[in-house]
Amino acid sequence: MIKPLIEFCVGNLASGSQAALEKLEKDPNLDVMEYGCLGYCGICFEGPFALVNGEVVQGATVEELVNNVYEYLDENPMF
């Protein structure tokens, strides 16, 4: 079974999204990856974000980012 892919930029992890990565890694239904740079420097500077199946998902806080990731997945099922 293909799992949704959640990608984080290491620069954004240092800016606060590390806690979101740790929460999402606990979900066995997700593939969570960390990369050196995802090429979204402007968005990265603004606040917590992740790529969810290649689409940018943001949140004002870590909690909001996690909620927005799950909301995006609910609204955009893979199959």
UniProtKB/Swiss-Prot annotation:
InterPro entries: DUF1450, UPF0349. It comes from the Bacteria. Belongs to the UPF0349 family. HAMAP family: UPF0349. This is UPF0349 protein BC_4937. It comes from Bacillus cereus (strain ATCC 14579 / DSM 31 / CCUG 7414 / JCM 2152 / NBRC 15305 / NCIMB 9373 / NCTC 2599 / NRRL B-3711).
